[in-house]
């Protein structure tokens, strides 16, 4: 929420810790300060991962602005950064520009910080989705996500998820974390082949 205060974020993190949530996503300006003594395991025990965004929600920021925003978030202590691609480049089939943008951002978000790339799949053809996923794999993105949920065209479709899963499978990058057969069964119930 744009009106969120530091107190709101602190309360969100406390609630996430209490509920055992793995992560909370906050605006870059609201990334909480790291504990004064990070070696104090009591201070960090059960604390959720801090995720944030860059180029959100439109993806229309200049590449260097996105990379700078992402790098600043890393320096503030973000554990994960979700970045929105410039979907116009994907629609136009400008794979080189897309790869260049993603490489610049990956350099700004060094591992072990997690880089998640958000596509707006509701706007993309099958080939554009496949090209975006291949670009994400090529630059070492850790995750590829279907949509921001903010675009008027809509969010994820099962077809888009299947296309992305197929492309990730080809690159041997499709994994199910922590759920194994249950995940496959659940996705199967939704009609997704994983």
Predicted region positions:
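Alpha/beta enzyme core
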Residues: 1-19, 29-192
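Metallocofactor- and cofactor-centric catalytic cores in central/energy metabolism, strongly enriched
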Residues: 22
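Small/polar loops that bind or transfer phosphate-bearing groups
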Residues: 26
